[in-house]
């Protein structure tokens, strides 16, 4: 999908083809892989705001911490509102998942081809804080997704509102437009 900040087109349509007062559906996707490590989490606030709206009827699906893995990000294309509350990487070139990058796990074999080549769709961010409890800090290597992975997802966003709350979310055209 594309966004209005990007090139202003959506599958051959322009902004004028859409009713600005209509969102494709009331399904909300919240992807928050670092709640266990962040002091301030926006997910509960967003849910409270949606619950308080007169128009109501929002159905929220939220994935947090390690549940917010690579496979879950593929679901977001069918939601009317998407919230990505995560880390960005590489100056706006990638978005981090909560999935631990374990080269002995079965998932690694699935991802291996996407991690290789001159233009990989995925990468690995090293030594990322995934949780904090007092002075105990848990750091792991996690998968990150480049714009080519996101723009290659099956499905189309149903006139969705996308809130990209991660560092670098709009720094580079490829990730911004993905």
Language-model-derived ranges and their functions:
Residues 105-178:
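Catalytic cores of nucleophile-dependent amide-cleaving enzymes
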Residues 3-121:
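A domain-level signal for caspase-like cysteine endopeptidase catalytic cores
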